[in-house]
Amino acid sequence: MKPTTLLLIFTFFAMPGIVYAESPFSSLQSAKEKTTVLQDLRKICTPQASLSDEAWEKLMLSDENNKQHIREAIVAMERNNQSNYWEALGKVECPDM
């Protein structure tokens, strides 16, 4: 009886984790969304110097307000809300270069 009880307890606690586990492609999807946002920001805030994508990303995310607006844009993209997406990108402040 004791092994059965332990099995039931384990199942009770393990199942929610299995059911709510993220898809293995979720990180790829969020990386794609982030890349799309940064590409659209390059169109809005055209850098004068040719920066690498990594340097551009660091520059754009160095400001806390920009981070928040970029998060808002990603959420709008996930919800397929184009007007909120472009509104959030419009709030991003282009850095001085």
From Swiss-Prot:
Protein name listed in UniProt: Uncharacterized protein YicS
